[in-house]
Amino acid sequence: MTHIISHEHLSLGRLKEIIENHEKVELGPEAVAAIEKCRKYLDSKMEDIGRPVYGVTTGFGSLCNVTIPADQLSQLQHNLVMSHACGTGETVRPQIVRLMLLLKAQSLSYGHSGAQLITVQRLLDMFNNDILPVVYQQGSLGASGDLAPLAHLSLPLIGLGEVLYKGKVRPSKEVWDEMGWEPISLQSKEGLALLNGTQFMSAHAIWSLIQCHRLSEWADRIGAMSLEAYDGRVEPFLPLTHQLRPHKGQIDTATRFMTLLDGSELIRNHKEHVQDPYSFRCIPQVHGAVKDSIRYVESVIENEINSATDNPNVFPDEDMIISAGNFHGEPIAIPMDALAIAMSELANISERRIYRLISGQRGLPKFLVATPGLNSGFMIPQYTAASIVSQNKGLCWPASVDSIPSSQGQEDHVSMGSNAATKLVRVIDNCEEVLAIELFNAAQALDFRHQIAGNKSSEAIEGIFSDYRKVVPFISDDVYMHPLIQKSIEFIR
């Protein structure tokens, strides 16, 4: 299947399909016409332009008052890409780099950036052939666009930098020769069009949202298993209470739990306790708030990826070139910080349920092992979960509240959205690990609950339990736990 880039709305769901199904991507007629029209207009303006145009006939940042001669405009753009490729730190994971390529091509396709058709096409050639530029996590302030990471993304276009191809990192020029591609001679404004933009932040956000939806679903499944294993009550999930406080996420979570628990024998057993701890009783409110946060951030990010986010903006029909600030990452930096907080809470409440399951309450043995003392059982997985959620709390300090002036004060307020983006990914990875540890504990506890109660949970929960037991066994005596935690993580991926 091939996805055609057009001016139609590109959704998170569609992006997920493109990435997971390894679909090819092509420019549609609408996009081609818009790109060529804008480039033709910009070329014509270069012939008789009577005033300086930022980034087109001038230097960049605080060098905006330096006028560049017409015969050096191409060199200006070439120099920009080379000089701005200053990233450091770990490399960006390949899935996110693929998204960066696609989102950059999408943004340039609206015909307000001035890119050549061959430039946009080459971005898609890299995407379609899984030739991924080596991009580094550190270097962007999330304001003048994601300058450093997008420079690394763009280096291969001019035959420089490195790419990941068929599992190996190689000089892009080598791969270009194999593909029969020539380095592109960037024209006026093109380097700036490539580097100005929020595609580093947006790609991280898109990848994160895909994972957030998956983990939110797993949190409900695992939470329901923990509820059954802990001999929890069903009343907090009944619809009447949630009609009094109709947050969509809360209602959706309660409804989901009632579906997961439908037909359970365990949930109908007589309960001596009147109510459950908050980590069980308030699952609809907490998991629901996370769902609402995901939904809100998704709406913001979808708006962002369907936008032109470089500078200046070119308007051929209006005969205008406007220098403005669509590259500023604040609109997505704040939501990404908020999403990190939401996912951290999903891990926080999960860790509390882990703690309850190993505490020797409601008939369950201490640390979920038949002979505690000789065996430590599930004592230390909770330590691991506690360590992870503690780290998340530090990672959730908002990046977007910080700003450091740059470029001799010309760029005096920045979003730090790139830091929000990379921190968000770490929080999500951590959340996945905590949920996997909860599943590890919940399945062990459910085995004991089966023995204690003599009956079973619902078909849905028992199905998950049965599938999980095919990869992670019941633990009778102490064993090497790390591989089992890793298998648990892989199970929910």
Regions found by a protein language model. Give the residues of each.
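C-terminal auxiliary extensions adjacent to catalytic cores
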Residues: 2-23, 27-34, 38-41, 46-49, ...
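Generic N-terminal targeting/processing segments that precede catalytic cores or assembly contacts
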Residues: 7-99, 118, 125, 209, ...
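FAD-binding core of FAD-dependent oxidoreductases
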Residues: 54-68, 72-76, 83-108, 136-158, ...
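Generic short alpha-helical segment signal, independent of protein family or function
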Residues: 65-68, 81-89, 101, 105-108, ...
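Alpha/propeptide regions of enzymes that mature by internal proteolysis
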Residues: 91, 111-116, 217, 306
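FAD-binding glycine-rich core of flavoenzymes that anchor FAD
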Residues: 111-138
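Cysteine-centered functional microenvironments
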Residues: 135-140, 317, 321
